[in-house]
């Protein structure tokens, strides 16, 4: 096992990365190794998808499968070795379909790729786990050096994040052949184990550029299906009655669940990154979508244990449900998996509803605590003139974008301290589950109108923040980096990595990121990123605030 993709990975004087029988996330060495094997088969699939495109051959199912299976290797998504092995087998089935299709127009085709003809050494998990060891991601680390190896992983993990967003968009009927061709290009290239540092840095930015198009596609899918988000009040306290909790990112699953539970006397609560659902007109119209429960994903073992109903995980982040003894009432969907947990293959939520009716539910209604969500792209852009007026009037001095992933490191209290310590003439635009560090605090308003805390949505809704910045830049006639706007990113896993690469690709400079640096990037690479892009780590809220304000004077 060698896994170094998330913040909680092992960091020791002897080296970084989880490399024992189990990772810090709870993933076994077997599952981790099988994920490496799956990635190798996906490299092969992408190599042949590119070859097929030379003959205008596209197998839609193969294109859709590739990023979906890659998504399964993200942190806290799928811990089920059997399903990971199944994805690897399916990858080669699609790969072979592509080879057959190419062979019909180009007899005996061949491509120059080290994984072009990879085959699996068996069908059992045990056989494949033995084979998987040769595809560990650190096999040539010493040969190419820590810097190049780290930036290669930056590309791989960034592409994982983009793959996740591609899958989120796909379930909302958004699919672009050109974007998938780009994805296959990057995935195939990574399978050649590139080692040139300059090329790797260029590709990292190119992956970020591709992801901007992916986020636009996802934004279109969400707004076309559910309407443009509007500001809405959300109760974060329990309501008496039977209940279901839904977590993850898949708003389509939530819509299906709401339709199937309507009139059954079951209250539905959002959790984690599902919170923004309360701002979408086609979701908030359901009266039994009563509120949001819990906080960041890292607290789920305690919070799910005391939630008296059924739970649905539609995407990341999942952690061991056996710790809180709720494995019998949690269900996984899509690419999520945990051994022994019931997996729903389609949108039939009957087992979830049945389990919810068996559970006790909340015995009484607690005193309401309301927070506001729904500041999506259209709402933010519509408010851009008002924002400019406040800036010109000297009533709004700076906008801080504080968002990204949450996690359990004590250092993450930095984000709470920073947000709450900001002057009253500043606003905080937040997104991702990092918002749970401060979204239940009262920030008040600016000039009696604009809320100081603006919840833009899920981590992929960085697109909304970017489009606001672009709009302000155009209306003020200044560059993006001249705006009184700063980004303080909270990273934990691969979606945050691709968000960062997207910002850098767009030319956004002086981003602050923390609470710690990724373990796969050494000090030399971090210094290089600081030199090229102004990327900085965190110090203290007071010191970083001072640096930010001084740069904008």
UniProtKB/Swiss-Prot annotation:
Residues found modified as Cysteine persulfide: 405
Residues where hybrid [4Fe-2O-2S] cluster binds: 249, 273, 317, 405, 433, 459, 493, 495
Enzyme class: oxidoreductase
Co-factor remark: Binds 1 [2Fe-2S] cluster. Binds 1 hybrid [4Fe-2O-2S] cluster.
Residues annotated for [2Fe-2S] cluster binding in this entry: 3, 6, 18, 25
InterPro entries recorded: HCP/CODH (IPR004137), Hydroxylam_reduct (IPR010048), Prismane-like_a/b-sand (IPR016099), Prismane-like_sf (IPR011254), Prismane_a-bundle (IPR016100)
Keywords assigned: 2Fe-2S, Cytoplasm, Iron, Iron-sulfur, Metal-binding, Oxidoreductase
Molecular function in Gene Ontology: 2 iron, 2 sulfur cluster binding; hydroxylamine reductase activity; metal ion binding; peroxidase activity
Cellular location(s): Cytoplasm
GO terms, biological process: response to hydrogen peroxide
EC number of this enzyme: 1.7.99.1
Location, primary (coarse class): cytoplasm
Reaction catalysed by this enzyme: A + NH4(+) + H2O = hydroxylamine + AH2 + H(+)
NCBIfam families in UniProt: hybrid_clust, PRK05290.1
Function: Catalyzes the reduction of hydroxylamine to form NH(3) and H(2)O.
Family from the record: Belongs to the HCP family.
HAMAP family listed in its UniProt record: Hydroxylam_reduct
Protein name, per record: Hydroxylamine reductase
Organism (species): Mannheimia succiniciproducens (strain KCTC 0769BP / MBEL55E)
Phylogenetic classification of the source organism: Bacteria, Pseudomonadati, Pseudomonadota, Gammaproteobacteria, Pasteurellales
Gene behind the chain: hcp
